Amino acid sequence: MAKKPIKITEVVLRDAHQSLLATRMTMDEMRPILPEMDKIPYFSVECWGGATFDSCIRFLDEDPWERLRILRRELPHQKLQMLFRGQNMLGYRPYADDAVEYFVQKSVANGIDVIRIFDALNDPRNLQTAIKAANKEGAHVQACISYTLSPVHNNEYFANYAKTLEEMGADSICIKDMAGLLKPYTCYELVSELKKTVKIPVDIHSHYTAGLASMSILKGIEAGADIVDTAMSPLALGTSHMPTESLVAALQGTDYDTGLELNQLNVIRAYFNKLREKYIANGQINQKSLGVDANTLLYQVPGGMFSNMLKQLKDAGKEDKLQDVLEEIPRVREDAGYPPLVTPTSQIVGTQAVFNVIMGERYKMVTKEFKGLVHGDYGKTPAPIKKEFSDFILKGEQPITCRFADTLEPEMEKLKAEASKYAIQEEDVLTYAMFPQVAPKFFEKRNARLQGVDALHADYENKSHPV
């Protein structure tokens, strides 16, 4: 009998495919294997949130809320987990408190059990509304430390932040190592410090990008970690995660034995292996995403950001600029006060780095989002931004010091009015709130399909269709 069995959060239905194939796994591809996955005694199955919401309506023509309801029905014995960006919800801007509260309420009502909440800047003010709302709905709140390397980030910084999150109502703490920067002995020291500081469980989430994750996770387990994120082996490694089967085998017969059976996992592995072969054959998995890139320790690009950036550069015919962009990212990050690179700051810093390289002059063109980051719209940066840089970017406008959401008026009534002509369920207003440019087209196609209209040949502008 294991003295301290390690719990597993399986991420193959969310972060694994977000990292390796830009979040393109469909519900139809997931559904056949769900009954087998439901037999495994996971701590939780991460299957929703993050970029899945955007991908569903933008690329897959799926209703993300319907996806969640199907997952809830097909995985009745599992705790379903989502990734939530705090005040940014699943969109790319800060939202008013009433929108955040409503989203949490609807997520739990539709089947979510565990809400992993993070803020890109580790600003606790951006998590307070989401944590309170999740506590109220009875969900398990897993609050994240967005792990990164910089002159201002150390174990004391992370431990103090974890203590703050525990006091705010977190049920567990996740070390969110989105870029695979966490080294083995550093992980041991960090987990040891966290276990001395907080009384709640500690989870390790570490991407394999730099080839460190397996070693770091093992040292973290030895230091007292309670939960570990892994992905089924066909969609593991590279910019994804440590393989589930490998960890299960490594811990068998030890004090940390997970209790998971390799024979049961092998059925799931065989299914996802066929999907992997399909993704490689049709080009959805970029081979560059599958290898180890130790340069990650220099430019700190997380898995999902890397695969999306590769796709964007390929689509623009600018793949030859990849190395230049990767070298520019740390410079932009230093200018912006060392934000951890995770959504939305990864997109903000990454896009600005791309502009700096393509324009041939740094900050010749500055995105609205980068100005917002410097202005304080996304929260307090880990290090102060130099005044001369702030003045240059903001053209003399003063940055804010309060919680940005405190400057926002309640917005749900306005959003409901705007979305009313499309909405057929209460959740649609939230889809619209996060993606107001993309959602209307998705709603029109979905609603036409539900009404038996040929969505491919419908004339949405003139509201007509062939019969």
Task: Please provide the spans of the model-predicted regions.
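Conserved, mostly hydrophobic/aromatic
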Residues: 8, 16, 37, 117, ...
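Terminal or standalone catalytic/regulatory effector modules within metabolic enzymes
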Residues: 38-56, 286-296, 300-467
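Active-site beta->alpha loop and helix N-cap motifs at the rims of alpha/beta catalytic domains
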Residues: 49-166, 173, 179-184
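Glycine-rich phosphate-binding active-site loops on the catalytic face of alpha/beta enzymes
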Residues: 117, 177, 223-241
